[in-house]
Amino acid sequence: MHVSMNDYLIHRRSDIPRVAREGLRFRRRWPEIEGALGLWVASLNGGRRQVSVSVWRSPEDLRRFVRSPRHLRIMRDFRSAGALYTSAWAAERLDRALIWSQATDRLQGRVDGVPHH
């Protein structure tokens, strides 16, 4: 399995509602995405920091999603609204507690070489 994490820091508080709305729309459609196994989201710092952790069958499934028209539109529409850091790693099994713990280590700077806000 392949895990991908997005750590997005929104520049202006006025952009928080539109970023949150789009994130909820995305989450509702998640079961329809080929190769997507899991998605967890978190909102921190009063909503300014949005984190998503997604689990995929393979890196190729993630690449196909990243190249999809819907994802490309979202990246274009929100490019200037915040700063995005991404990281990825392999997971042996779909274990929510373990994967979230690995994500937390990255978010808190406990994994060398992984940028975070």
Give the positions of each predicted feature.
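Short S/T/G/P-rich N-terminal loop/turn motif that feeds into the first structured element of a domain
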Residues: M1-R49, D61-R64, L84-H117
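Short hydrophobic/aromatic beta-strand micro-patches
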Residues: L9, V53-W56
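An amphipathic, aromatic/His-enriched active-site/gating alpha helix that lines ligand/cofactor pockets
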Residues: P59-S87
